[in-house]
Amino acid sequence: MRSFNMPKIIFDIETVGQNFDLLDETSKEYFLKFAETEEEKVEAKNSLSFFPLTAQIITIGMLEFETNKGFVYYQNGGGKAEKFTEGEVIFISGSEKEILANFWSQLKNYQQFVTFNGRTFDCPFVMLRSAINGIRTTRNLMPYRYAHAEHVDLSDQLTFYDAMRRKFSLHMWCNAFGIKSPKEEGMTGLQVKDFYKATRYQDIARYCFRDIKATKELFKYWEKYLKF
């Protein structure tokens, strides 16, 4: 079956790392092992958000390609449960475990999923955090890399599986293709941790959704001009 006949879902996650000072001493030593300068130590401490062993998923955004309906599941610091809509997008708060359960429940409705850099970040992160939370993964988010019938990772596709000298951010790809970057509204992925500390949970959720809207537009270019 050709992929344009398949129901597609685009998804993206946002994560926040643990407080470095709360790690046990062995874990601290592990992260600081190769950090020699103060700058390198700060960088190592800030890297906790990149690893499923030391971070939580605080937001998962999902966007149906065909209908433009969106679902954003997000943590709100354990506050009162929230549910609201903005246009075609439903925002639902919950714990990390509830976020992941909602993700897997929604994912079963689609045959193909689209990410940007999902193979090296979002997909393994979701699978491992699900296991850590005692949630059985119901689908392999890491299928064979060199086929895109099930998973289209646009970072892989647009660099022709790392044939280019380097990878580029979603922001730079958006600029190249004339797509509105999710960063244009004053927030970047590097600010997620600070926004979370400031209890700006809904701002993070909206930022995540801007990411997947941009990913959808980029996917349309790839599908029309580069897909074989």
Name each region found by the language model:
Residues 2-7, 55-58, 63-68, 73-87, ...:
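Metal-dependent phosphoesterase core characteristic of DEDDh/y 3'-5' exonuclease domains
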Residues 2-98, 105:
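Conserved RNase H-like, two-metal-ion catalytic cores of nucleic-acid enzymes
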Residues 26-27, 99, 192, 203:
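A general marker of short, structured functional hotspots
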